[in-house]
Amino acid sequence: MEPIEDLDVLAEDEVRQREADGEVDEDLDRVKHGYDATAGDKQVYIETYGCQMNVNDSGIVASVLEESGYGLTRDQAAADVVLLNTCAIRENAERKIRARLSMLRSEKEKRDGELMLGVLGCMAERLREKLLEQEDLVDVVVGPDAYRDLPQLLYEADATGQAAVNVELSKQETYEDIQPVRYDSNGVSAYVSIMRGCDNMCTFCVVPFTRGREESRPVTTILSEVARLAEEGYKEVTLLGQNVNSYHYTDADGTSVSFAELVDRVSRVSPEMRVRYSTSHPKDCTDDLLKVHRDRPNVCNYIHLPVQHGNTEVLDRMRRTYTREEYLALTERAKELCPGVSLSTDLIAGFCGETEAQHEDTLSLMEEVRYDHAYMFKYSERPQTYAARKYEDDVPEDTKQRRLEEIIELQNQHAKESNEAEVGRVHTVLVEGPSKKSDAQFFGRTDTNKGVVFDREDYEKGDYVRVRIEDCTSSTLLGTAIEKTTLEAAARTDSITTSPAVA
């Protein structure tokens, strides 16, 4: 997934720049959930690492525990149970979680065994034996498909003093009947899980081994959740799945719903609610889906299309199922059907066997597409994957690092030029909350997923505001508010075509 928009995340220098600008999102590499403390015999504190799906899963965990009488707290010191919802997508993520467990070990010792620790999610599924053998401080180890059993597992671990484990993957579990606790206190944007698992088996990716096979959630439960969020005042939903655009559900009466049809139906729940999704696979990005972007004004004009690499031979080794030429044709089709569309991607430097010429192909593809955003990484070998079993991780670390830095440098240049081109244009911005630099300013996003800062004046969180872009940094647009609007009104009046800048 997008490195949570899939975060998972950004290249380190882009994070530093966005932090310097004061507009970097909450670092989803580690999210301390801001649950309000609730009554309960035992208090639970949850930390989440990784992608948007993990964030949503933590909301499911919170809901399950509340139903069983647990309280939720934002104060770790007040917690009887600390749960780490983990990510296994890269080695660095696992190192961070191990370091966090080491810190918690000393705290557990200080509390003389009164603190229970749990490891949830992808790392729990992948490393269950090592967690139990090497991290003997862990009381529960629970995989992504076993969260309904968490209250019972906590009870068993507490009663017996022995670690309780359930990491079984399920072909049916979608948690369709559970409403996640919305830890995001802004009340503006919410995640809605529509499917789980992945069937693609890319050679570098551990997700199919930690999340299991694809299982789509019933359409009716998705639409009900979105409708409930609209009633609660949310203005944006992001549909989530490991491979979200492979969504396909068949009702008991035989009626089949594709992802394009689902997005269209979600967009009709409330014309004043923006719709996004993450993360998609290029092979499943159809004309029907692109036409929904074009025809439905509240479906954001932003598509995440992870290419991973710019060379066809490397893409074949990655088992991505498309060629460089096919991918480029898709991006051209997206730009043709959806004028002004913003494209983002994932890029891996130094995959097994990558030559200098193949690396140059990635750079040249970037020049052709000119992404607005990118999530960029060095290749990190993951156990269990086909690449770990069959390919040699033969690109030296210093070469990987140098190639990654070249990718980052080029992407930063493209992002800067893209933002500079926005000066003088008017965008509809959804206000997410105060700017991190100043309470006198608001921060929000365009439907092309660009961050915008402007003086807050009399506007409120959750408003749609027409903003003229006056200036920019490499990561943020700076604007002047024109007026409050609605999505329906903006569809008639807003434009992303260049207009004269205010003198």
UniProtKB/Swiss-Prot annotation:
Residues 420-483 form the TRAM domain. The keyword Cell inner membrane does not apply. [4Fe-4S] cluster 1 binds at residues 51, 87, 122. InterPro entries: Elp3/MiaA/NifB-like_rSAM, Methylthiotransferase, Methylthiotransferase_CS, Methylthiotransferase_N, Methylthiotransferase_N_sf, MiaB_methiolase, rSAM, rSAM_horseshoe. Its EC number is 2.8.4.3. Residues 42-159 form the MTTase N-terminal domain. It comes from the Bacteria. It catalyses: N(6)-dimethylallyladenosine(37) in tRNA + (sulfur carrier)-SH + AH2 + 2 S-adenosyl-L-methionine = 2-methylsulfanyl-N(6)-dimethylallyladenosine(37) in tRNA + (sulfur carrier)-H + 5'-deoxyadenosine + L-methionine + A + S-adenosyl-L-homocysteine + 2 H(+). Catalyzes the methylthiolation of N6-(dimethylallyl)adenosine (i(6)A), leading to the formation of 2-methylthio-N6-(dimethylallyl)adenosine (ms(2)i(6)A) at position 37 in tRNAs that read codons beginning with uridine. NCBIfam families: miaB-methiolase (TIGR01574), MiaB/RimO family radical SAM methylthiotransferase (TIGR00089). This is tRNA-2-methylthio-N(6)-dimethylallyladenosine synthase.
